[in-house]
A protein has these predicted regions:
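Non-catalytic tandem-repeat scaffold regions and their flanking low-complexity/translocation tails
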Residues: 1-184
Length: 184
């Protein structure tokens, strides 16, 4: 209406200075013009608008870096980087798993992206809900290994609960005393 571009965020709203509406496109938290890239109302320093692309709710990248809603991920192998889910948890917040050829990443929307140590990159996959993942040897919940989980019998129950032949879990915590057989 007034020839300006505004953003509307959870905690604040504002004007994106120097951006023309005809030159601006956005997707959820991410935006770009021919001269700059944005996360909400924040200009992403050093981001390249010509190569910038949104990968999912939680991740975006350009020719030099991968970005999350918490900032850049250092030392990413850009050519091999891939997101493993839609990047949005069930409450609508940006969250999800990604990997390159060397390591696996988990972004929960609050702070730095976690590198999942010990994950088998080649077989690692998200189970689609942005909370749970697995590789050939382990189960992961919220970016952490379920160290006691028995891989062959583990199953996801829903609403952040899972179980194996011996235990019941809520995200990455064992629920002591829970009866595995009657817990559904």
């Amino acid at each position: 209406k007034d020839g300006a571009v505004y953003f509307s965020g959870l905690y604040e709203n504002g004007l994106l200075k120097g951006v023309a509406p005809k030159d601006f496109c956005c997707w959820r938290y991410w935006g770009k013009s021919s001269t700059a890239c944005f996360l909400g109302g924040i200009r992403l320093r050093g981001a390249d608008p010509a190569s910038f692309r949104v990968l999912n709710y939680a991740y975006a990248m350009d020719k030099t870096a991968v970005y999350t809603t918490s900032g850049r991920i250092p030392d990413v192998e850009l050519a091999a980087f891939q997101v493993l889910d839609n990047g949005q948890n069930d409450s609508g917040a940006p969250q999800g798993y990604a990997k390159d050829s060397r390591q696996v990443y988990f972004h929960n929307g609050d702070g730095k992206v976690k590198i999942i140590k010990g994950a088998e990159v080649s077989s690692f996959r998200s189970l689609g809900d942005t909370y749970f993942a697995r590789d050939e040897k382990r189960i992961y919940a919220y970016g952490k290994q379920l160290s006691k989980a028995e891989l062959t019998s583990w199953e996801l129950l829903g609403h952040w609960y899972s179980r194996d032949a011996k235990r019941v879990y809520y995200l990455n915590r064992e629920i002591k005393g829970a009866d595995r057989d009657s817990f559904t």
